């Protein structure tokens, strides 16, 4: 039976990427060695790193003066590194969910944190629109897609101060005006690679301006100067990231990923809105295309476990919603084929007919 992987992350990767990575695990570049055991200082892996960085910049149209880094520690490490490197006195944060809240918590150890707006009182079911960003803030931080609650910023916001963004779950799903940001970061295990590598886009001239001492491993300049090789990088995930970037480029780049994301999300949301058994949880204007969250309608609430089993038996994997929201979550990242979304829709319609 075909499996349809709707997991929120680690998540689905393109089949071609998995196959190429599997080949490299057995024999990397005809070397007779596995990519798991080659030196990160060798010319073969340096070529992988160089290509991954070049493709990253090309696909996102990153301007001159920015570096792309592949680091460890996940987005959670970036919650600390961002204020360590950029927060001198005050930073502004938009609180749209658990991950934004965690980022704010870390930043409070480095200076004043202004929460410009929050949707916590509504369990983060919408993204606040009416707020003022302090003109004297060192930066304004946003989380562009909220995996738990199924909300997404529709494009780049305007800000009177430099912006920082956690794009863990929607990177490469749409065009981005990188020039608006001094830093964009994210865990790669949604739209880019297996878990274990973190991507960071950082504006070179924004680094080195805070007065505090920054430990070497937490200093962006260290990793810019070292080409992401100050310490041993996560070799295998970077290799897979390079293969994913090749795939994105071959498929038509972020414009095509954007088109596909909208098409897949529109299909599933249309069924959620049509089907009497299901209800979407996020405000319609803020609905995420990456993480589609829904619950059983109140009169069918007692059938939630039944639908989960029914869907699982039909090959749907990873659709159980986060514990803070409940219900279901279908994550439709770039590698998710339209056919899998249709399979979930068929499953929902079949369940409806049975009840």
UniProtKB/Swiss-Prot annotation:
Name of the gene: serC
Provide the reaction this enzyme catalyses. O-phospho-L-serine + 2-oxoglutarate = 3-phosphooxypyruvate + L-glutamate; 4-(phosphooxy)-L-threonine + 2-oxoglutarate = (R)-3-hydroxy-2-oxo-4-phosphooxybutanoate + L-glutamate
Question: Which enzyme class, named as a word?
Answer: transferase
Q: Which domain of life is it from?
A: Bacteria
Q: Outline the subunit composition.
A: Homodimer.
Origin species: Bacteroides fragilis (strain ATCC 25285 / DSM 2151 / CCUG 4856 / JCM 11019 / LMG 10263 / NCTC 9343 / Onslow / VPI 2553 / EN-2)
Q: What this chain does, per the record? A: Catalyzes the reversible conversion of 3-phosphohydroxypyruvate to phosphoserine and of 3-hydroxy-2-oxo-4-phosphonooxybutanoate to phosphohydroxythreonine.
Which residues are noted in the entry as pyridoxal 5'-phosphate-binding? Answer: 75-76, 99, 147, 166, 189, 231-232
Q: Where does L-glutamate bind?
A: 41
Q: Which is a Gene Ontology cellular component entry for this protein? A: cytoplasm
Question: Any idea where this protein resides?
Answer: Cytoplasm
- Which NCBIfam families does the annotation name? PRK05355.1
Single biological process term from Gene Ontology: L-serine biosynthetic process
Q: Give the protein's recorded name.
A: Phosphoserine aminotransferase
């Amino acid at each position: 039976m075909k499996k349809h992987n709707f997991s929120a992350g680690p998540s689905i990767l393109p089949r071609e990427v998995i196959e190429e990575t599997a080949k490299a695990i057995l024999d990397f570049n005809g070397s007779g060695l596995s990519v798991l055991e080659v030196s990160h200082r060798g010319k073969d892996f340096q070529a992988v790193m160089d290509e991954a960085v070049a493709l990253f910049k090309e696909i996102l149209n990153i301007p001159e003066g920015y570096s792309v880094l592949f680091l460890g520690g996940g987005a959670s490490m970036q919650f600390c590194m961002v204020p360590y490197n950029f927060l001198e006195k005050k930073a502004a944060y938009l609180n749209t969910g658990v991950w934004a809240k965690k980022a704010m918590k870390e930043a409070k150890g480095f200076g004043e944190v202004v929460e410009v707006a929050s949707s916590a009182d509504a369990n983060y079911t919408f993204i606040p629109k009416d707020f003022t960003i302090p003109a004297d803030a060192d930066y304004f931080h946003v989380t562009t897609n909220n995996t738990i609650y199924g909300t997404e910023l529709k494009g780049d916001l305007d800000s009177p101060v430099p912006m920082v963004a956690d794009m863990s779950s929607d990177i490469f799903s749409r065009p981005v005006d990188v020039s608006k940001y001094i830093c964009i970061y994210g865990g790669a295990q949604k739209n880019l690679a297996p878990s274990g590598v973190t991507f960071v886009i950082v504006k070179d001239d924004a680094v080195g301006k805070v007065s505090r001492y920054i430990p070497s491993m937490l200093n962006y300049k260290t990793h810019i100067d070292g080409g992401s090789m100050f310490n041993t990088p996560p070799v295998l995930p970077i290799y897979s990231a390079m293969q994913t970037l090749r795939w994105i480029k071959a498929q038509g780049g972020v414009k095509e990923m954007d088109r596909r994301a909208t098409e897949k999300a529109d299909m599933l949301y249309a069924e959620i809105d049509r089907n009497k058994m299901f209800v979407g949880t996020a405000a319609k204007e803020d609905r995420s295309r990456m993480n589609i969250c829904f619950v059983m309608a109140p009169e069918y609430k007692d059938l939630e476990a039944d639908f989960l089993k029914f869907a699982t038996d039909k090959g749907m994997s990873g659709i159980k919603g986060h514990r803070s929201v409940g219900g279901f979550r279908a994550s439709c990242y770039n590698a998710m084929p339209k056919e899998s979304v249709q399979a979930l829709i068929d499953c929902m319609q079949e369940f409806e007919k049975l009840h």
